[in-house]
Design a protein with these regions (language model features):
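Short, Lys/Arg-rich flexible segments
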Residues: 1-94, 99-104, 113-116, 120-199
Length: 199
């Protein structure tokens, strides 16, 4: 699943939840306000109709290949400010933009590494990294029908990564400002006296 993350120190979020839930709530609100324009722009990049007729009308020669649905792709582009898993350095996602749907992920990233190797529909095995289409050129033709990938600081893509690139750092700057503001306010509260654990 394609993801754009803003990472921060997990101890800050834990401390806010325990001692200053009002600041935690404000941080989540500010992060959402920073990221919502990127989400809206990314949804706008999903074409109303499939880039090729075969993708919408049938499963592109493979029963498990997801069909194109603009509404599904748009609803699958979401934002969350719930902290994610902590990495070995003590950081977790402070904010995350997801491209959750299978069709959305395909539209977003297809062609990053070129077309999948073709093995044909009669090949054995269950590998997901190969093309089992009856057409050996299906992968290349599929990619040719899609818009070019857009490079961003978070990766290449056609939806969330394109929106992130066109945002030109505004969302990231606003998110970092929100985190810095809450951190300073929390530190000021600590300096003013002992904090009580939230009920």
């Amino acid at each position: 699943m394609p993801v754009i993350e803003m990472r921060g120190n997990v101890d800050l979020r834990k401390a806010l939840r325990r001692f200053a839930p009002d600041l935690e709530k404000q941080l989540r609100k500010d992060l959402a306000n920073a990221m919502k324009p990127v989400v809206a722009k990314a949804r706008g990049f999903a074409p109303a109709d499939a880039p090729m007729s075969g993708w919408a009308a049938r499963s592109f020669g493979e029963g498990k290949f997801p069909t194109y649905s603009a509404s599904t792709i748009k609803s699958g582009i979401t934002f969350t400010s719930i902290p994610g898993k902590v990495n070995p350095y003590g950081f977790s996602s402070m904010a995350k933009i997801n491209n959750k749907s299978a069709a959305g992920a395909i539209y977003e990233t297809a062609g990053r590494n070129g077309p999948q190797p073709w093995v044909g529909p009669k090949a054995g095995g269950s590998s997901k990294g190969v093309s089992r289409s009856i057409n050996p050129e299906a992968g290349a033709q599929f990619i040719e029908n899609l818009p070019a990938l857009t490079m961003s600081s978070k990766g290449r893509g056609r939806l969330i990564f394109k929106a992130w690139a066109q945002d030109q750092g505004k969302a990231q700057g606003a998110a970092l400002t929100a985190i810095d503001k809450v951190t300073k306010t929390f530190n000021a509260k600590i300096s003013a006296g002992p904090l009580s654990k939230a009920a």
